[in-house]
Amino acid sequence: MADVFPLILGIIILLASVISIKTGISVTVVEIAVGVIIGNLGLFHSESWMIYIASFGGILLTFLAGVEIDVDLMKDNFKESFTIGFLSFLIPFVIVFLVTYYIIGWELNPALLTSTALSETSIAVVYSVLTQKGLFKYKIGKLIMVATFITDICTAIALSVLFTKFDIYTLLFYVVSLAVLVMAYYKSDLFFENPLFKNKIGELEIKYVFVLLLGFIFFGSLGGGQAILPAFILGVILSDHFKKHTKGEVKARFKTVAFAIITPIFFIIGGMKVSIPLIYSCFGIFLTLFVLRQLSKYIGVYYPSKIFLKQNYNYVTMMMSTGLTFGLVAAVFGLNNALINQTEYSVITGILVLSAILPTFVAEKYYTPVHSEDLGD
């Protein structure tokens, strides 16, 4: 019998885009919500190839987010970005850990894993929303992206330091990642500037980057590392090539490939992983941790944003309060390594998905900067 699930997936992706356009809600939010619904109603079952594409989609989004980083802006606004990004990580991490370990009574590893997963800000959600709203051309969008980068670097470091079991393969992952990043910095012109390869129908520039990202994923899984951090740094390294040498043409083609099919699978599969029955069985814990996470994110982002920014601090706070990408990576890592159980995994994932939907909806509905004087230069 022919496999009907790829066709169903294609229809779901198309319908999510139609709903997004009709309602004005971010397609990212719609895709996650659809994933939650179809997953819990048993209307769709993910296959192994979909799960792999979903994981690759998260890495690809992370790379594209890195491409959008303005290095000059990061240097010029490092104090603001670092303060907002670091507090966005630190305060949720500390508060969630104290509550899960000392009040709820979870064991040390689940408490640490949960606090790590819930401290992140979703690069994928932030990047998708800022791209769809066209905010990357303005200072506010770039500032949010840099602050998100700082937050997730802290999360990645925490996950690596607290849980990674270092062995020869872990060392290999870091050595290979460093070598690839150095090579990409010095040798990428061979693909981006060579007339033999540049702007050809074969899209060698895109395939070149895909190979590097797949390499990060392979060596990361081999050595227990996380491909998100080197993927993001690769994007930052190649951002200059995309901006100066290709005049944005390759980046535009990258976005077409990513947003047409790959990233929708990431968001839909992410939503499908939420088990509503398991969340319902410990709804009090779920609600408590969700509220604590959002409040601690608010405290960590709103007040420094209000100090550094004359306006739009509500929008910055809402966008920095989103969660999903690296939190899902941390949750899957914890489940696969028996650091958390299925119920704890569902609670973490449910909180991440809800935090991807609600703050994004509020930000877009009430706080999106619309006037040129609101956006900055």
Enumerate the language-model features and the residues they cover.
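Membrane-interface junctions of multi-pass transporters
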Residues: 19-23, 36-80, 195-205, 211-288
